[in-house]
């Protein structure tokens, strides 16, 4: 069991998706990454020369994703950024290439004991993505250079808690993350 407590400490402390170099570490998991945080984690894991059964990536999304990050990204890169409603609640991002929905549902079922699951929007989507199972969306993690795609773990999930929810507290968000890990491990031990 390997636990990496915080891949992007500066981003966490400043409630910011970027690192001090204005790079999004979570979308920088590729060889020769310009994000030192991503490169260090890949080097650390790569040096182990291990196959991994599970990769679970614990995230939180705050309102600053739309109020600060997306406008700054649009200004910097001159690319229109579509803002979407940040879901009020917990949800998961599975790997589109291998979603393993029973694992995702086991995580959701455990988290439901602690906090609410993000509902879909009026189009039946969460952040613009289809929802194949309650509280679950899928991204191609390798193609997007996401943390969950760099190590070829058999099972993969990324959690998203929403600390800006009027019904959430830091304690609830932390308990939801613990419940997610517990749900994943319990599922694998069955």
Please place each PLM-identified region on the residue numbering.
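Structured catalytic-domain cores with a bias toward divalent-metal coordination
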Residues: 1-190
């Amino acid at each position: 069991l390997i636990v990496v407590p915080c891949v992007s400490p500066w981003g966490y402390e400043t409630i910011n998706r970027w690192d001090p170099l204005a790079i999004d570490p979570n979308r920088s998991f590729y060889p020769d990454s310009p994000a030192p945080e991503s490169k260090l984690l890949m080097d650390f894991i790569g040096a182990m020369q291990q196959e991994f059964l599970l990769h679970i990536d614990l995230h939180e999304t705050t309102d600053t994703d739309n109020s600060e990050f997306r406008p700054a990204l649009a200004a910097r890169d001159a690319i229109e950024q579509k803002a979407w409603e940040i879901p009020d609640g917990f949800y998961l991002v599975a790997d589109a290439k291998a979603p393993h929905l029973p694992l995702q549902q086991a995580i959701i079922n455990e988290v439901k004991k602690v906090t609410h699951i993000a509902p879909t929007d009026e189009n039946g989507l969460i952040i613009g993505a289809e929802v194949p199972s309650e509280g679950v969306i899928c991204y191609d993690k390798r193609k997007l250079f996401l943390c969950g795609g760099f190590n070829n773990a058999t099972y993969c999930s990324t959690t998203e808690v929403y600390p800006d929810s009027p019904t959430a507290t830091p304690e609830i968000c932390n308990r939801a993350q613990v419940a997610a890990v517990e749900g994943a491990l319990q599922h694998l031990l069955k």
